[in-house]
Amino acid sequence: MTRDLEKLVAQTILQGFDAQYGRFLEVTAGAQQRFEQADWPAVQQAMKQRIHLYDHHVGLVVEQLRCITGIRCDDADFLARVKHIYTRLLPDYPRFEIAESFFNSVYCRLFNHRELTPDKLFVFSSQPEQRFREIPRPIAKTFVPTDGWQNMLEKLLSDVPLRLPWEDLPRDIGYIVAYLQRTFSAEQLAQATLQMANELFYRNKAAWLVGKLSLPDGIFPFLLPIHHNERGALFIDTCLTSQADASIVFGFARSYFMVYAPLPSALVAWLRDILPGKTTAELYLAIGCQKHSKTEYYREYLHYIAESEEQFIIAPGVKGMVMLVFTLPSFDRVFKVIKDRFAPQKEVSAERVMACYQLVKEHDRVGRMADTQEYENFVIDKHRISSELLDELWREVPDKLEDLGDRLVIRHLYMERRMTPLNLYLEQANAQQLHDVIEEYGNAIKQLAAANIFPGDMLFKNFGVTRHGRVVFYDYDEICYMTEVNFRKIPPPRHPEDELAAEPWYSVAPNDVFPEEFPHFLCSDRHIRTLFEEMHGDLFCADYWRALQQRIREGHIEDVYAYRRRKRFSQRADPRYTTAENDSGFCRNPA
């Protein structure tokens, strides 16, 4: 009887995951219709809905198990036996890897993230890495330019399943061919093979054709973002073939793609060729499997810990007033713990901070806010913690620590991509880097604002610089919606002595913001202030922010491009007469 109950529980968990992933695919499949109808508010709503599906279905399964098993549901040894049976259900299961993560989530919900040991949950996968020699549904279709690139691209684009007309397909094909001829030699293009993913990748206002361009000297990404104009006609906005550009398109600071992937492991394996710099966790994250990516991030962390002898240290940069941040010297992640007590000037609660981090996960991050993974009861061997960090932990977050002798448990933390703090980057930057990064910094603020996000604290220390030179915001405790802020001009002084007074001569409400004050606390360096005013002086005007607010209230959703504006075909000269692409510097207001 007990054996039958264990089998029933294992099957219930797997069926619960089937239901979750079925709904995940259902929401994803609606991306084509939302794109064709230009229903951008529905795009944003579907993104949030899909993120919530996972936790919702975990909750449903947990309630089912409590009804089925009674008190045995709280028996860790019982669930360890269930895990053994569950493992035997997976060898022929197409989404085994995410099913394992779903089991982990159910277990953690039942046991409040306690007793997290390999015998009770899938710390590592139970299945071999290369599961499927043959897949039931091909990931991609192959094209060969036997009759020339023009004809091949015409066939490729004519097969796109979108039910909208093309604005000018011959023109777009001409743009693509001209770009390829500038980028690669005629000999390379003659020997090329192109593989294109069968499914479109939807995000924001674009549907992406994603492909692999195989040339004699290697494999290159081949990315074509499809947009449509105000009349509902399709056009290709650019062609991207560099790994750096592809990495940004699939970057950690962007919303997840909606791509129909009934076999996600096969899609991830296929993408790895064009995104060799991305880890397994990052690829699962890019296609929207954020909970499984969390599992993979943790596995990457465990692998790094096992292969290194580094100690955890306090992260470089200015210490935060809300978060304690630490890292490993050569690891590409940081760990952030909410402090038990905040500095007096920080009028927020821990609950508010956590809500801000959840808002960022669900919101369109427009390439300017880093995604995070949330962990509970994170265990670290004490000998791997530097004495300075250990002292800092006990000083700042004692309520979130549990001492297990040779190990330390941190009850709650966030893991986030490590970047160079902007304030540290500025100290080392040469003249060109300084110009570029200040332009990027202003662009980041503008793009966040256009996406209805006001960063709140815009000091340099709250932004990071990625390896691609992009500026990304990562301090979320003061963010709010743009529509919640009251942008004001500073009233003229009533008397000359008002300007010398310690207190302002005008009233200030909690949500009041005075953009005229930004230069004083953002740019103490005169040279940096001059650069910023030249490129982004409009940020110091209340009218600029009010105009953005009005567009947001009217329901306007801005176009977001995962590449520089100068790369857009519409921004270039006629490609038939262009011999080289302008590739210098950052553009003004890239989106």
From Swiss-Prot:
Its main location: cytoplasm. Pfam families: AceK_kinase (PF06315), AceK_regulatory (PF20423). It comes from the Bacteria. InterPro entries: AceK_kinase, AceK_regulatory, Isocitrate_DH_AceK. GO terms for biological process: glucose metabolic process; glyoxylate cycle; tricarboxylic acid cycle. It is found in: Cytoplasm. Keywords: ATP-binding, Cytoplasm, Glyoxylate bypass, Hydrolase, Kinase, Nucleotide-binding, Protein phosphatase, Serine/threonine-protein kinase, Transferase, Tricarboxylic acid cycle. It catalyses: L-seryl-[isocitrate dehydrogenase] + ATP = O-phospho-L-seryl-[isocitrate dehydrogenase] + ADP + H(+). GO terms for molecular function: [isocitrate dehydrogenase (NADP+)] kinase activity; AMP binding; ATP binding; phosphoprotein phosphatase activity; protein serine/threonine kinase activity. The keyword ATP-binding applies. GO terms for cellular component: cytoplasm. ATP binds at residues 315-321, 336. The active site is at 371. Its EC number is 2.7.11.5, 3.1.3.-. Bifunctional enzyme which can phosphorylate or dephosphorylate isocitrate dehydrogenase (IDH) on a specific serine residue. This is a regulatory mechanism which enables bacteria to bypass the Krebs cycle via the glyoxylate shunt in response to the source of carbon. When bacteria are grown on glucose, IDH is fully active and unphosphorylated, but when grown on acetate or ethanol, the activity of IDH declines drastically concomitant with its phosphorylation. Belongs to the AceK family. NCBIfam families: PRK02946.1. This is Isocitrate dehydrogenase kinase/phosphatase. It comes from Pectobacterium carotovorum subsp. carotovorum (strain PC1). The lineage of its organism: Bacteria, Pseudomonadati, Pseudomonadota, Gammaproteobacteria, Enterobacterales. The gene is aceK.
